[in-house]
Amino acid sequence: VFWDQDVRYSLPTPTPQGLEQPPLGTPVDLSTRLALPAAWQGRPLLLHFYSPDCPCSRFNADHVAGLLQRYRDQVVFCEVLEADRAHADEDSGLGLRQFVDADGSLAAALGVYSTPQAVLLDGQHRIRFRGNYNTSRYCSDRNTEFVRLAIEALLAGQTYEPPPAATVSYGCELPDAEA
């Protein structure tokens, strides 16, 4: 089992046919998909796409916890769980506000097709980053901490241009995103 999973999750997640990923800078209307508290309006939002069934989601929990600890006063962190789960109440243990993407429409609108993935939106809900947390499975390569780099750029008023490695998904396919 170990070797099977090691090989499986070291390869990119197959890209679904017909996948549409909105370009960075695209505004996203969240009003019909997420019930965001008024206090979150105008604040950057990090959507952490997570599945407790995905080993890769569990591998990056410590890294996400570090991001949360460092940026929680400046960025709102949310966890998005996939729809068809018998135990959708299981979470990452990070204490994040959870949203269940009941019909997969949020993931589809943002171009997300696997977990773990992150989408960083600015205060006007424009996509500023979509992709991996790191090229390393355990998020241990500081030079490729893509989400951290995107957050730092956003908070500094700069645009982050992610390298191609940041957008190649590794992990578990979402149920409605089969290749």
Q: Model regions: which residues?
A:
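Thiol-/selenol-based redox modules, centered on thioredoxin-like
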Residues: 127-128, 132-179
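Short, thiol/selenol-centered motifs that function as redox-active sites or metal-ligating centers
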Residues: 51-62, 85, 169-179
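Structural micro-motif
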Residues: 95-97, 112-119
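Short active-site neighborhood of thiol/selenol oxidoreductases, capturing the structured segment around
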Residues: 36-64, 77, 151
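Structural microenvironment flanking redox-active thiols in thiol-disulfide oxidoreductases
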Residues: 58-93, 99-109
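N-terminal targeting signals for export/organelle localization
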Residues: 1-28
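A short beta-strand-turn-helix
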Residues: 20-44, 63, 69-71
